[in-house]
Amino acid sequence: MEKLVKIAVVIQVITLVVCYFSWVLDGCDPFVPFISDTDTNPASSWAFTIGFTLTGALTIPLSIQFYNVRRRWAEQNHGSRIETMNLLSAISVALSGISIIWISYTPWHEQMELHMLQARVIFGGLIIWALLSTVISLRMSERDARFSSLSQTRRSWTVFSLICLLGLAISVYSYAGVSLSIPAGHMDTVLECKDLGHPSLSLAAFFEWSMVIGFAGVSYTGVQEALLIDQ
């Protein structure tokens, strides 16, 4: 299982890198598109579609595998109180995985409302999963000191992701207020792949990329968890 986690994380990181550099090498503005913006440009959309399809396809079986190994661990460690959190964590990340596959074929400039719904399911599901996984690892460390390092590392990545989420929210709010609508002319700007036109939007995009990297970090802690549970 730990090998599958490594493969999933590597694919996710490679996808982000290839999407960004394909965007830049095509002459687009380097600072900074939203991740989904790279799906609007033929030079980078192929990497977005292939990479996130594979990421989502690996996320779903991993959610099932981690649910099962954690369930078995809980059965052997009565009183750990992770059963409900384990189920909710598995469901939330599985839904995110399904939405990641779906959004790979839903460019936002073609199906805006559907794309935004998918994005909220992805990020909402990943936030729930990261928080619950962090609490689960804390409960594990309370029963078995070997999980202490895992708990600390996972907590650090989760906190980093939440800080990035806060930065994303503040940046978007400073530009658009409470409105969730896309600013007029923004689509044309993205399709021309030039500067987003406002520092707050580029800063929000930077926080989005950073948050996704943070989630990849949380995912990678699954390698250590799988090894510890198997021991």
Locations of regions flagged by a protein language model:
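Membrane-interface helix-boundary motifs at transmembrane edges
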Residues: 71-83, 111, 142-153
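Interfacial helix-loop-helix junctions of multi-pass membrane proteins
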Residues: 110-117
